[in-house]
Amino acid sequence: MIRHFFAAFAAVTVFSLAVSGCRTASLASPEPSEDQPAGRLRILTIGTADSGGTMYPVGKAIAQAISQADASITVNLSASEGSVSNALALQNGEIDLGLVSGDVAYAALNGQQEFEGAPCRDLRVIAAVYPSLSNWIAPSSLGISYVHELKGRRIAIGPQDSSTALSARIVLDAAGITETNSILKNDGLGSGSEGILSGSLDAVHGFAGVPISGFSQLADAMPCTILRYTDQELDSILSENYFYYRDVIPAKTYPGQDRDVDTFGIKCLLCVDQDMDEGLVYELTSILYENAGSLGRQHPSLFAMSRDRFMCSALPIPLHPGAERFY
């Protein structure tokens, strides 16, 4: 069994239980910040990632939604190296808002991995904003339906040290698939899909928002199957990796996919420091909640915010008190 991030902190489940249900009734008016008088311009900075990934356009959409909803708030974008940089920048007071993936947020709060010896104890969540889901694709000609049937085959798990490869190894470990009984290659989506087409690979793993465009193109080019997990496998994965949550790849997400596929994912979180004014966080949370639908039209990944309880449930670290009060 490979070593997982969270063996020492099983009590993290209380974080996702801190809010037993998200707000579903009509919204109350946002409560003003006590530390920011009405009419005073507030300039905030949101940390994203490089412009080629998902975080940058997502951050841009969030910044625009907040700035347009409240003329007294301006949100500026800050490109960064991604989740780790954003967590550290929040801790150091260099940014006000930051996009941080759930696994990194948990590691930061608890001083694990890159944060060993330097935890970000004050990291808190306003809302989950989009998911990345585990997707496995294989040629239908193999005649397999489940991930565990990949044992003994040639598998592209994702680039070295990527979240795609990390999640793939967690999955394969649960399924009893190792480098001694199978061929695991650190190919990404592009080279992995090419390997499927050429016959040099049997399956590819993707860990991203769905649909993954490369998988859609591959399923257009040849009959493919989106592989499933058994309930036992999902239970094992989720019980040992508390930053993951259960989700579904809906039927017809990919060409030829005629049924829902149960899977797991990780949420990208909009984070702040514990010390951010509670009234301001309440207002920001309200803006995001009220604009969830329009945010999805700005970037498809953000449609998840419109799903019941997505924004405030199954979180790996605590909500900020202002966000918790809103929900």
Residue ranges with predicted function:
Residues 261-326:
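Segments of small-molecule ligand-sensing domains
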Residues 41, 70-72, 82-85, 92, ...:
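Extracytoplasmic
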Residues 1-42:
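Short, low-complexity disordered leader/linker segments with a strong preference
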